Amino acid sequence: MTQINPVTHYAVEDGIAIVTTNYPPVNALSVEVIEGLFHAFDRALGDAAVNAIVLICDGRTFIAGADIKNINNAQARPQVDAFELQNRIETSAKPSVAAIHGTALGGGLEVAMTLGYRVAVPSARFGLPEVKLGLLPGGGGTQRLTRLVGAREALDMMTTGQMIDAAQAHRIGLIDEIV
């Protein structure tokens, strides 16, 4: 396993790149996480020995949203922003899988939606809670969620900020498999 940065690790097993984020307590989408994921995906996409990419997170949860302690901190702007990361993942020619446990909220769900396939444990929960903070999903979540689940379900998730469980996420098409 190779350390991309202090919160992102990279390994290749049997042609599958495994990108792991570990930023306790909730794997918030911090500057370090965004940059680490970008560089790990860049590495996997440039490696001819890699046929697919899996994104997993250590700890108790997947990516639980933006790192709100840095939301207004101009000094905490990443060299690579979340849109560049999402575009890099979404336009990849290699298959990619988000392996979700715990919660995938806000920016974390937006990252998960950029991967081609999403699997989750039965206890996983999903949501776009930005409305509860007086915000709108800002990382492409409004468009991607609508494409995945349809306008009615997407609007409900975005306007209520309520979380849904893995069974409902699977039923509406947000995730592809419960494992």
Specify the residue positions occupied by each region the protein language model found.
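Conserved CoA-thioester-binding segment of acyl-CoA-metabolizing enzymes
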Residues: 1-58, 72-73, 87
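Amphipathic alpha-helical segments at domain termini/boundaries
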Residues: 1-20, 110, 114, 159-179
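Terminal peptide-recognition signature
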Residues: 19, 36-37, 55, 67, ...
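Glycine- (often His-adjacent) and acidic-residue-rich active-site loop
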Residues: 35, 49, 56-88, 104, ...
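Glycine-rich beta-to-alpha active-site loop
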Residues: 59-60, 89-133, 137-138, 162
